């Protein structure tokens, strides 16, 4: 299985087997994880429901229980905006440097779900940005002025591609 990722991760290796998202799948947050990770979990939950029809529950506990978990965790040891994404036949683990790293790991998993649906190939991805500032410059002075809802949608799209700055002129 060959998948396209934008931007291309720093390290990518495929394994044997697949992980299947189904009705028993859950998104798991450690009870000590920062509250900001919940928004990344909600984003992933919405993507899974849109693409597969399954709506995994979001759980917070000290210890994960069961298989078919999508485990989101923050690790301050990773460099800024870095993450690892491990898809095994049993579980998916995203470990990121606080909120931004976990969010970028979720965005990579969203790209996988859009290409493969509910049956994901096993993969190990380790990624960190090649450039600290990745921006989009939008000249809003010519033509129609963008609405707030359009700018929010644009920010979401830029986040999907791991662009971390939006500049309006």
Describe the role of every protein-language-model region:
Residues 124, 136-138, 165-169:
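Core alpha/beta catalytic barrel or barrel-like domain that forms the active/cofactor pocket
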Residues 109-116, 139, 157, 161:
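Mid-sequence acidic-hydrophobic segments that form the walls
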Residues 150-169:
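Catalytic domains of carbohydrate-active enzymes, especially glycoside hydrolases
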Residues 105, 148-149:
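Short, solvent-exposed loop/turn and secondary-structure capping segments
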């Amino acid at each position: 299985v060959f998948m396209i990722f934008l931007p291309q991760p720093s390290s990518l290796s495929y394994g044997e087997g697949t992980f299947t998202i189904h009705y028993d799948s859950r998104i798991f947050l450690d009870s000590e994880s920062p509250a900001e990770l919940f928004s990344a979990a909600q984003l992933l939950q919405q993507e899974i429901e849109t693409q597969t029809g399954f709506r995994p529950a979001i759980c917070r506990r000290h210890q994960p229980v069961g298989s078919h978990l999508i485990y989101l965790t923050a690790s301050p040891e990773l460099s800024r905006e870095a993450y690892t994404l491990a898809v095994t036949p049993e579980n998916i683990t995203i470990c990121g440097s606080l909120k931004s790293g976990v969010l970028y790991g979720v965005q990579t998993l969203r790209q996988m779900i859009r290409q493969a649906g509910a049956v994901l190939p096993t993969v190990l991805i380790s990624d960190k940005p090649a450039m600290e500032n990745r921006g989009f410059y939008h000249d809003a002075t010519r033509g129609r002025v963008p609405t707030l809802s359009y700018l929010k949608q644009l920010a979401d799209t830029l986040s999907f591609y791991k662009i971390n700055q939006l500049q309006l002129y």
